[in-house]
């Protein structure tokens, strides 16, 4: 996801990594070794899981709420729900572990992995080359960012170029912020970029007239326009890329077990069922991959 999931959604190298976006393409140099892939072929995800995780019996997964339908609270509660929480639960079950799901600030997710506070991050996080300097990704989703305006598109915005000279709100630390900043570098009359904590707070700036547009991940935009007639979504997606489940660079065994667990869920239909339940089945991947962003 392009997030603060934001972007997202991620100290100096980790924070820089958060701002990157990537167009999906094979990244073979970062993939598991051939021997690891061969070993995984004949073993279940639970069998691939390193002993230290089997002994703990718990899988600690972090997410950053604010990106429905990917991760959010159930209305009136602090119970995490959405695509990523449901998929995290399914992966934990394949690994025969109890899921411990935590909400955290998006820009603290990768540092949390590096410090050992979390085992995995599942938070609409785009698999980008800069982020892969800090973490490995098991890619499970593919989408891009879209421009959202008030209903009727009163500024007649048709593309990123039309944002030049206007006030735009973008989630801090997100890939969508990166998209906006790249466009701003091309603008003769610069955008005035306001940074929000997440997509919902960004939309409040549209509501109040403080901003005329935002860029959010397509599944998020789809959810908001389904729930409210106050917004309009432009059709073009920018920065289309895989989103990944992040694991620390020194946890290759866990990464491989999660890769296998995701493939098992793809094969048995459980993965697609989760995505379809939340209305994002069109962003499904055909196979689980590792470090497949550009």
Predicted regions and their residues:
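C-terminal motif of bacterial Sec signal peptides marking the signal peptidase cleavage site
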Residues: 19-22
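Extended ligand-binding regions for polar small-molecule ligands
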Residues: 24, 85-94, 153, 174, ...
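Periplasmic-binding protein-like
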Residues: 65, 142-149, 218, 222-263, ...
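Ligand-binding clefts/hinges and TM-proximal coupling segments of bilobed small-molecule sensing domains
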Residues: 25-31, 36-42, 48-49, 175-193, ...
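Short helix-initiation/N-cap motifs at beta->coil->alpha
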Residues: 85, 100-111, 155, 193-205, ...
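Extracytoplasmic small-molecule ligand-binding "clamshell" domains
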Residues: 34-122
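Acidic, polar ligand-binding/catalytic clefts
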Residues: 89, 98-162
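A ligand-binding cleft/hinge motif common to bilobed small-molecule-binding domains
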Residues: 125-132, 181-184, 207-239
């Amino acid at each position: 996801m392009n997030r603060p999931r934001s972007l997202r959604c991620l100290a100096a190298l980790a924070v820089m990594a958060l701002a990157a976006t990537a167009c999906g393409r094979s990244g073979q140099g970062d993939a598991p070794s051939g021997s690891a892939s061969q070993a995984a072929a004949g073993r279940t995800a639970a069998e691939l899981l390193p002993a230290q995780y089997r002994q703990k019996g718990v899988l600690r997964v972090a997410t950053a709420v604010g990106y429905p339908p990917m991760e959010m609270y159930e209305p009136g509660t602090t119970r995490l729900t959405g695509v990523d929480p449901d998929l995290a639960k399914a992966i934990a079950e394949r690994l025969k572990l109890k899921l411990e799901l935590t909400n955290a600030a998006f820009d603290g997710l990768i540092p949390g992995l590096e410090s050992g506070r979390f085992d995995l991050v599942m938070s609409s996080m785009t698999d980008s080359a800069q982020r892969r300097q800090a973490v490995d990704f098991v890619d499970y989703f593919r989408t891009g960012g879209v421009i959202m305006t008030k209903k009727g598109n009163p500024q007649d915005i048709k593309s990123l170029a039309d944002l030049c000279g206007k006030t735009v709100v973008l989630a801090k630390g997100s890939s969508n912020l990166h998209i906006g900043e790249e466009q701003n570098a091309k603008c003769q009359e610069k955008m005035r970029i306001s940074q929000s904590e997440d997509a919902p707070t960004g939309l409040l700036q549209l509501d109040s007239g403080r901003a005329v547009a935002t860029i959010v991940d397509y599944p998020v935009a789809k959810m908001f326009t389904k729930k409210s007639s106050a917004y309009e979504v432009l059709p073009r997606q920018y920065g289309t890329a895989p989103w990944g489940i992040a694991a620390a660079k020194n946890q290759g065994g866990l990464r491989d077990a999660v890769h296998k667990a995701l493939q098992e869920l793809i094969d048995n239909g459980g993965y697609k069922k989760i995505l379809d339940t939340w209305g994002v089945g069109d962003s499904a991947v055909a196979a689980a991959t590792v470090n497949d962003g550009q």
